């Protein structure tokens, strides 16, 4: 019998570790906490880490806390969220975005509508792509020594988290660039169940477009 709560619990995002501009580490710790407190499976098998970016590293997202605009839009180089998809359940996948002003968590459909705004016409260079990585694989392989947050003179572009950098289980110190590298050429050509199952079992998961995102979560094993 699962110890996971049957209904989504509205939470205060400030209860979770959050360091501005270190979203990949924030989500790493968020997923760990959700698994530890019973909101997600203890194995984290129902959690997926989603990197959002593109070739130009310019992705517009709405309803972001960092925005100074009324519509909350921010042009990120990349962003990272957690999506929870409960197995053997008809409930909609949930998005956990610590940087969003939307309810925490939010149903995936409403998050896509409000944050991705697929109906908003964008130039091709601003199209968003999504790399979906199964959380257990993310915990095993992801690493960041925070080099991407340092200026040439060694100073920080933003104050780093107070804890030690994340190291992969095999000792790798930094591979963030592998996770945020994505383009239209990387997206799945088919969302048939066999292709999705094979892709999601890979270290770097699978890349999809915004039109494929919601459908993907219905095809996961």
UniProtKB/Swiss-Prot annotation:
InterPro entries: N_Gln_amidohydro_ab_roll_sf (IPR037132), NTAQ1 (IPR039733), Prot_N_Gln_amidohydro_ab_roll (IPR023128). Keywords: Acetylation, Hydrolase, Plant defense. It comes from Arabidopsis thaliana. The gene is NTAQ1. It is an enzyme of class 3 (hydrolase). GO terms for molecular function: protein-N-terminal asparagine amidohydrolase activity; protein-N-terminal glutamine amidohydrolase activity. The keyword Membrane does not apply. The modification N-acetylserine is found at residue 2. Monomer. It catalyses: N-terminal L-glutaminyl-[protein] + H2O = N-terminal L-glutamyl-[protein] + NH4(+). The keyword Nucleotide-binding does not apply. Mediates the side-chain deamidation of N-terminal glutamine residues to glutamate, an important step in N-end rule pathway of protein degradation. Conversion of the resulting N-terminal glutamine to glutamate renders the protein susceptible to arginylation, polyubiquitination and degradation as specified by the N-end rule. Does not act on substrates with internal or C-terminal glutamine and does not act on non-glutamine residues in any position. Involved in immune response. Belongs to the NTAQ1 family. Its EC number is 3.5.1.122. This is Protein N-terminal glutamine amidohydrolase. It comes from the Eukaryota.
